[in-house]
Amino acid sequence: DIPFHSIVLMGAGEPLTNYEEVLHFIHLANDPELLNISYRNITISTCGIVPQIYRLADENIPITLAISLHAPNDRIRNVLVPISKNFRIKDVVSAAEYYFKKTKRRVTFEYILIKDMNASVENAKELCCLIGKMPCHINLIPINGTEHIKLYPPEWKEIKRFQDILLKKGKETTVRKQMGDEIQAACGQLKRRYLNSVT
């Protein structure tokens, strides 16, 4: 058996739309008689289902919440995260702040960097204003391109410039290391291929 000490619910559907089952799983994972995983080592990733973020906060379980933000405003986010049309970005951030106040657990904001879309100096400044003084961690993720979607990561100097603006505003910020992109197996690149059968 390979021991493990953390769990991340991400990339297999929206966890907060399966709320009851996810919560049940979290409690089972924490059970000393089962996996005995600390709540603090469990992360739920969400695209920002506002009512469920408040609901999760009121459970007062000290798990880590990661929110796929990806934009500093509704105009850009509505393109990148279609479900955001149901929840304004300011409401998502307000829910995140409530989560922090209730659980004392700092929220992580995931932010994919896409060239000529959300990675400008103005975007970085707008992101700082959006988040305000809320304690959080910002995870910058240069997009991994695919052969079918013509979206590209910014140049490294643009990524660094974006990060530096956030750091100067006191935002703890890291850039995710890219792994597997050379074989189309990085985050966002895994896909199913259909082969035409020859008859």
Pin down the residues of each PLM region.
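Conserved AdoMet/S-adenosylmethionine-binding subsite of the radical SAM
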Residues: 1-169, 173
